């Protein structure tokens, strides 16, 4: 009965002090490590570094970090994620250790270093002027295509064949069988006879005879 009264008092004070506050101002010095043994396996445990997450025992000796839905925070007293209006900061690890098997370890909070402003003095810079050496134009070479020398073709003149008839032998050789110029030539007719005698005419027409008498046939 006494423990129930103490829990009710803690809930009332926490709800009165932190109701409607999503960012808790409670200063936690330690965080818990749950071995997930015994009845602790059915309990959801707070993560003091980030109330958007919590620990759940998926099996004996194996806690797993779970995420709350967006814009919700884990409330240990309700064992669920709630909105800002119903958020209640979790009790300290030392308080939970009195009734559970959790272990408390020192909480190392990340420190945020203050931003440092570095003053920089612009140094005077002297512009460096570089003079480019004069460029010598490179003579351009014009390549011209020279026509190939052509060799004129020489045409050979056609061969001329000369037939030389042998000249008759001259001199004092033996006599040949050449015709003698003393033989007289045959006579040549002065007029060709183109008239031939006309053949005789047709024989005279034979005399005509009278019509023969008709033959009378005798009847038996």
Curated annotation (Swiss-Prot):
Reported modifications of this chain: Glycosylated.
Cysteines joined through disulfide linkages: 68-84
Pro residues: bias regions: 197-210
Stored InterPro entries: Chitin-bd_dom, Chitin-bd_dom_sf
Keyword tags: Disulfide bond, Glycoprotein, Signal
Function: May bind oligosaccharide structures.
Protein name: Peritrophin-55
Organism: Lucilia cuprina
Taxonomy of the source species: Eukaryota, Metazoa, Ecdysozoa, Arthropoda, Hexapoda
């Amino acid at each position: 009965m006494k423990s129930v009264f103490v829990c009710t008092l803690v809930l009332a004070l926490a709800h009165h002090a932190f109701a409607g506050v999503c960012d808790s101002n409670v200063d936690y010095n330690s965080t818990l490590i749950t071995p997930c043994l015994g009845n602790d396996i059915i309990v959801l445990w707070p993560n003091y570094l980030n109330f958007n997450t919590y620990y759940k025992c998926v099996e004996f000796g194996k806690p797993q970090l779970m995420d709350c839905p967006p814009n919700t925070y884990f409330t240990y007293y309700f064992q669920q994620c709630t909105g800002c209006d119903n958020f209640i900061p979790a009790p300290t690890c030392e308080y939970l250790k009195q009734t559970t098997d959790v272990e408390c370890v020192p909480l190392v909070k990340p420190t945020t270093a203050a931003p440092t402003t570095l003053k920089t003095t612009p140094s005077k810079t002297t512009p460096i002027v570089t003079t480019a050496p004069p460029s010598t134009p490179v003579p351009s070479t014009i390549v011209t295509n020279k026509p190939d020398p052509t060799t004129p073709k020489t045409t050979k003149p056609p061969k001329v064949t000369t037939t030389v008839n042998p000249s008759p032998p001259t001199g004092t050789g033996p006599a040949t069988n050449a015709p003698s110029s003393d033989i007289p030539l045959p006579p040549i007719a002065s007029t060709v006879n183109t008239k031939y005698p006309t053949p005789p005419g047709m024989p005279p027409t034979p005399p005509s005879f009278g019509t023969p008498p008709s033959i009378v046939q005798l009847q038996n």
